[in-house]
């Protein structure tokens, strides 16, 4: 539902922001939107391609895979629990046709018929190609809701942090060598500089120190203009978590108008604060690869800077956007966990869910607002790295709605101008809990768990693995219980 804009200090901030809109238009470059525009577009294209492939398969009515004259069949059917001999009769059918059963599982149907508890069976088996239709007909005589399906195949995802070396699929839409609308397209010196800095990311491997970049005077001048302009605005528009982290970054990581911080130094700072670390990237990653990195508490970060002719906006991610917008927020523990949870939810997800998660990321991590005190503040990196959009977001112009993951994931996003709709979170803790509920509804036959000791992903697809995870939780609870006893 819409958020009221009439609270005390919020009104002051909004009035101030409204009076600054004209100034914003006068000092900003043409309205390029920062960071995740292509994250959603890329996810959408992948989903449409997958849907087209599924449609093609459906039109051919392929319900099994064929290999060496054998059919690999995935078969679902339902047996009434009151029919005790039913299962033995069903298994007899598979035996008669010399079917080799690879997998058999049961589950209670969600909608039992006639008030009786039904059991649904899933059988993956191998049978002679010529016997498929006869086997299915035989099962239909003793079972209900008989159907076949293609095997559900889930996308590969990294299980170890070192496997992020394979997650480097770039989206080239905003490459200055290819995009004629890019501010650097007609500048051969800038394009050559971009290629040189991009090579650092292409060559980088996990575990290596991030190479340092010696920035030019022109690049530092661009940084200085953005840094000084935004820093003054943060005091009235940025959330308290961003302000606190920004002060620490100035104290410990060389944040200042006169120098561009090095990723290696910033990465060490983040790792000590929240366990997040940076990894150099040459441009916009595909949605799936970018989100997978977050699952390991790794943020893929660019080292190049926007073109000097467009200091206040960039059509793509750059170090201004990353260092001023994302890094301070990743220094907050609750927000860092929220970001990682989006990444964990993406692992093995369908193309449709990747698109929804990308859109959810857009309206939170990139363009999110939150309640603080009697007002509303910005926490999204797309806002905190863009003077014009930061002013716009807290003015009277846009609509503000209460954060709801389902609604945010389905909201059309604006990529040609400032957003017309922003979502406002009660708190990062509240947003994290809402995301947890949303992620639980994503259709995967497994859950995942991040192991912070080995920086790996554990796939929870059987009771033994879940029991092992619970043992770890029990150990941690014992430590906390003992601590309470000491204080009692």
From Swiss-Prot:
Activation and inhibition: Phosphorylation leads to an increase in the catalytic activity.
Alphabetized InterPro entries for the sequence: ACT-like_dom_sf (IPR045865), ArAA_hydroxylase (IPR001273), ArAA_hydroxylase_Fe/CU_BS (IPR018301), ArAA_hydroxylase_sf (IPR036951), Aro-AA_hydroxylase_C_sf (IPR036329), Aromatic-AA_hydroxylase_C (IPR019774), Eu_TyrOH_cat (IPR041903), TH_ACT (IPR049321)
Residues with Phosphoserine modification: 38
GO biological-process terms attached to the record: dopamine biosynthetic process from tyrosine
Sample GO molecular function, one term: iron ion binding
The UniProt record lists the keyword Cytoplasm: yes
Pathway field: Catecholamine biosynthesis; dopamine biosynthesis; dopamine from L-tyrosine: step 1/2
Record's catalysed reaction(s): (6R)-L-erythro-5,6,7,8-tetrahydrobiopterin + L-tyrosine + O2 = (4aS,6R)-4a-hydroxy-L-erythro-5,6,7,8-tetrahydrobiopterin + L-dopa
Cofactor: Fe(2+)
Enzyme category, top tier: oxidoreductase
Stretches for region Disordered: 1-29
The UniProt record lists the keyword Cytoplasm: yes
Reported function: Plays an important role in the physiology of adrenergic neurons.
NCBIfam families linked: Tyr_3_monoox
The protein's name in its UniProt record: Tyrosine 3-monooxygenase
Lineage: Eukaryota, Metazoa, Chordata, Craniata, Vertebrata
């Amino acid at each position: 539902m819409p958020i009221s804009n009439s609270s005390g200090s919020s009104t002051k901030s909004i009035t101030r922001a409204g009076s600054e809109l004209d100034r914003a238009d006068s000092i900003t470059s043409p309205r390029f939107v920062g960071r995740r525009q292509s994250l959603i577009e890329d996810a959408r294209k992948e989903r449409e391609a997958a849907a087209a492939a599924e449609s093609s398969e459906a039109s051919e009515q392929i319900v099994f895979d064929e290999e060496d004259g054998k059919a690999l069949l995935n078969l679902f059917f339902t047996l009434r629990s009151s029919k005790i001999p039913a299962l033995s009769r069903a298994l007899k059918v598979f035996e008669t046709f010399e079917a080799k059963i690879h997998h058999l599982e049961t589950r209670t149907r969600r909608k039992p018929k006639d008030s009786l508890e039904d059991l649904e069976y899933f059988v993956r088996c191998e049978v002679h190609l010529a016997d498929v239709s006869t086997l299915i007909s035989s099962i239909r005589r003793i079972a209900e809701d008989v159907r076949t399906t293609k095997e559900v195949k889930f996308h590969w995802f990294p299980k170890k942090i070192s496997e992020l070396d394979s997650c480097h699929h770039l989206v080239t839409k905003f490459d200055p060598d290819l995009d004629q609308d890019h501010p650097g397209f007609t500048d051969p010196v800038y394009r050559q500089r971009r290629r040189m800095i991009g090579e650092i990311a292409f060559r980088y491997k996990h575990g290596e120190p991030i190479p340092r970049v010696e920035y030019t005077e022109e690049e530092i001048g661009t940084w200085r203009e953005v840094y000084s302009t935004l820093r003054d605005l943060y005091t009235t528009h940025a959330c308290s978590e961003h302000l606190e982290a920004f002060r620490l970054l100035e104290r410990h990581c060389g944040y200042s108008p006169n120098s561009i911080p090095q990723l290696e130094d910033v990465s060490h700072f983040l790792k000590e604060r929240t366990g997040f670390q940076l990894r150099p990237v040459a441009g916009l990653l595909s949605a799936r690869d970018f989100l997978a990195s977050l699952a390991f508490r790794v943020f893929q970060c660019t080292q190049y800077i926007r073109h000097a002719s467009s200091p206040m906006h960039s059509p793509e991610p750059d170090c201004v956007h990353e260092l001023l917008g994302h890094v301070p927020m990743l220094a907050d523990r609750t927000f860092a966990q929220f970001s990682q949870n989006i990444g964990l939810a993406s692992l093995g997800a369908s193309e449709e869910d990747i698109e929804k998660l990308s859109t959810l990321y857009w309206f939170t991590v990139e363009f999110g607002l939150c309640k603080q005190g009697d007002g509303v503040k910005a926490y999204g990196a797309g806002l905190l790295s863009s003077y014009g959009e930061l002013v716009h977001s807290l003015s009277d112009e846009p609509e503000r709605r209460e954060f709801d993951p389902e609604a945010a994931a389905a909201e059309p996003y604006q990529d040609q101008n400032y957003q017309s709709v922003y979502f406002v979170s009660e708190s990062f803790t509240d947003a994290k809990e809402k995301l947890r509920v949303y992620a639980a509804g994503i259709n995967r036959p497994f859950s995942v768990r991040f192991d912070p000791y080995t920086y790996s992903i554990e796939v929870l697809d059987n009771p033994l693995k879940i029991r092992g995870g619970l043992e770890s939780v029990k150990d941690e609870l014992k430590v906390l219980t003992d601590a309470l006893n000491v204080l009692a």
